[in-house]
Amino acid sequence: MAERIRQTIQSPYLPTAMVLSGWLLAALGYWGAWVWAAPVGLRVPGIDLAEYVKFIAEVRNGQIRLTREVFLFPLVAISLSMSLLAQRSELRLPSVLRWLINLLAIPVALAMLPPAWTPSLLTTPEFIKQTVAMAICIVAAGLSYPLLRRMPLTVSAIFVAILALASLVLPVSAFLKLRIPLDAIYGHPVDFGSGPILLTIGLLLVASSPLLLARRR
């Protein structure tokens, strides 16, 4: 058993399995329920929080101070890490899977679009920051093969790790500030869903994988 564990840890495919699992878990966590309720319609997924918090009275009147865009950070982390890592030969991914992940970075970025958006809405002060973030992610997806795969692995690894950790700490800590107003909205103590837990595990895996690759070089 100990020998099998040692072989698994030393396997060249371990970082690949970690980052693929990380992307999947982070996506499941972000699109999964952060506020749990038995009726499906009362559950709040992570992807809705950037809009949802605008309607919480304590946030609107400044009693709870948070920047709603932090709830979009996981999308930025998933999309940019896909663009930075998908085409890297060190991950030993099949060519088809490389391009699939590379292309998936674009719809992940587009998930930052506000509901019922129009081109003019995207340039308003309320949405310009997420529009810029979305544009950066889409451009990065286009540069993944010709440019980003040639970056030094250590640079990519450090950038992905910092981005993933920031995209974990900032939204989760902001979400925890909402516990009391959420209890008031629902009329009882709310149950948190599995979303934050899955996102945490996923982004920790995404942060660790390229660092492990860089350490093994």
What is the role of each PLM region?
Residues A2-R217:
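Compact integral membrane and secretory-pathway proteins
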